[in-house]
Amino acid sequence: MSNTTTFTLTVLPTTLPVFLSASDTSLGLHHNRVPLGYVCSSATTITVRSTAAISLRFLNNNRNQERSVTVEANSSSSFTHNETYVPFADRVVGGDARGYVVECTVNNYLSVLPHYTRGLTDEAAFKNELRALDDNQSFAFLELKNALLLVPPPDKAELLALDLGALDNFYTTIVDTFDHLIGLVNVASDDPATRNFNKKYFCKADSNGVGAAYYDRNWTAQTNVSMSRYLQPRATNWLVLHEIGHAYDFQFVSNAPALNEVWNNVLADRYQYDFMSFDERQRDASVYENGNRDRVERNIAERIDNRAPYESWSFFQKMAVFTWMMDTDCGRETMARINRQFRQIKTFDSSPRYMPTFDWWVLLSDGDFVPYLKLMQVEFTSCRVLSNNNVVDTFLHTNSLVRSKRVYYPVKELIANFDALTNNYGFVAQSNYSLVAPGEVDARASLVIHCDIDDARQIAGQIFYVYDGTRLVWQSQIDDSNRLVVNDIHAGVYTMVAPRGRDKRYRVYFDEPASIAGLNEHLYLFADTSKPTKRLIYERLDSSPAGDRVAAHVLGINDLYRAKVIFDFKAKRMSVHSFASSFNSGYANMRYFVINVKRDQLYTFNHTFTGTQNFVGVMSVDIAPGDTMSSFHQQGDTRFIFLNAKSLNFTLNVSENWYSNTNLPSKNQVLETRMDECVAYLYANASRLIPFENHLKDELYLTIQSLPDKDYYMRLYNPFLPAHFKFNTFDPTTGSNSIIMAVVIFCFVLVALVIVFILVFVNQRGRQNPNAAEQAPLQHS
């Protein structure tokens, strides 16, 4: 029997949002298409004429039996295909808003394609039409609000038994949840980077697909002759949640550490969080391996104990790290801010650069997750790549201090006998690793802090402060034994603001826990129930950190951050911090970045990073005067940055306390640049940093002392210096001043601040600092 039909079809375009390009594959940009309305066979001939160049696809449930053809504008073409198939016309991405018109003749088709459109088609009538078809040609098409499903014959019975309204709701809630998590809105918005578009996800079967299922440019598919998993509207349907989540893998996801197969799972996990009860989540959530939360936690605890880099963890272990952050009050908003800022950068920056995700996360979040992420063996780059590939400091640790963030930490790490299952503290938690801020659990701790300092007079009589966010929790001075006794505060992690010396400068840090031991930029006080004794170390500083150590930065594919090389001339050590296993996949197993150190013509260190499958972690080697460091980077003219100089090759001759290379900045130039960075950051955050002693003031003072014209800079930057070195400052342990003198000093400082800002930012003695404006902390949108 010969069936022939001729019809005209208007195909409207897919809107191209400003934050995507036509070549992108995200958000199902190329998934939207229109069926021609018939099931066809090898005997079918399709003749098409279109007002625009279009793609026709002849689809079924096997990629090896499908075909894609192009129809040129205003020309007539005829096609056949030697399989059973359903023809579709792609919507043009970013095409004319009026769409294009297709004149089509289908000769000798098998049957009319049963087509269900939500809100328009009667479900019973649709199913009757499908039921009447022969099983071997019973393809069906579902046009839902956010999904298009080409259902193959093997799923006929399941489709007939399915509530299509429930299926539509399933896909709608998935897309709405994921869109909300990344900050896309469906209402009119003045910000084009937040506006949604008419996207739909095309779902099908593909018996020759990859893995169990996949997401790609043109559709998402189950690797089977059946697509039954895509027809099961339930919160435990991880396959569908996971694959649609891949639509939200934007360019920054592959930054260090690579979060491919993780970022999409974070979205999928939030769907389960929203649509499961507490008991269901304990039993069925994928993040807890379907009822094995204890095992998940034990395995992660083992990773922590072994100090295994986060990059080496399994996909689901990596996801769990995000799960516990997302469970907090500020988790979702942080994810939305990252995605909004990504879209703004991609939209308005002609040479976009994206931060490593965890650096981005802690800078944009309203909560402080630094101690938690350090516990989870995450290493921060603490720097930002600019559009010209110069690299600047983000002051990552200081950012949390500036913004007075509350600190979140796993409850089990604070309260040793806490058990989420028995709820023994009356605090409902999804996991023993659920994150809490101080006071959220009714458990208290008392601490004795021993201050280990070479000269107790440097801190005697001065106040130590402990904060929970902006709230002052405790304050006191050291006793005669150089101790601080903190009684009965809530278990949690706090910020301590400590005196840092009078005429001496110190690195100040706690020696525990190991994950943050030695952190000088932000003092985290751990009030836990099992370790009542703490040790606060005062390590004497007599030189500027900027003059003691310098860093080089290794970028890889798409200018993503890959490694940092640190030369510590004071400690006589070079360390290489590798943040990602894949540097540039285009180079595969060929050499990409090489660095070595020679002493007396013999290698003391020699390592080659290839394009892929590299070591992740830290490698170190001792260096000594007379050593030579050499490096090679395949793309080093833009992607190996040493003090913002770029080259394929660098050679450094190590001297007693610096290096010899006339193509690189001198030590004084490095110190002056760092001085400008410190002043710019202190100025931008004066209200929070000026009133308190902090590491940045110390660094500024020590940097100035290392410069030949230090007296000038001591006067110029006096308001930003540690208290002991400010003009006419009064040390209460040495005598008393009159009220009049105090008022005079206060007025002088105010006037000095105004004068300094004029001098620094208008003149700066003729020196330029093109990066200063970009070194203030990132602000959330």
Model-found features: residue ranges?
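Beta/coil-rich, acidic/histidine-enriched accessory regions frequently appended to metallopeptidases
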Residues: M1-T4, P352-I566, R573-H577, N657-W658, ...
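Intrinsically disordered cytoplasmic terminal tails of membrane proteins
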Residues: R765-S781
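Extended low-complexity, serine/threonine- and proline-enriched intrinsically disordered segments
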Residues: A52-N64, R340, R457-L472, S578-N606
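Extracellular juxtamembrane-to-transmembrane boundary of type I single-pass membrane glycoproteins
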Residues: T729-C747
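Short, surface-exposed beta-strand/beta-hairpin micro-motifs centered on an aromatic residue
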Residues: S77-F79, S481-D488, N614-S620
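Single-pass type I membrane-protein transmembrane alpha-helix
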Residues: V749-R765
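Catalytic cores of extracellular degradative/oxidative enzymes
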Residues: N128-D327, M335-D349, T357
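Zn2+-dependent metallopeptidase catalytic core
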Residues: R33-S41, T51-C203
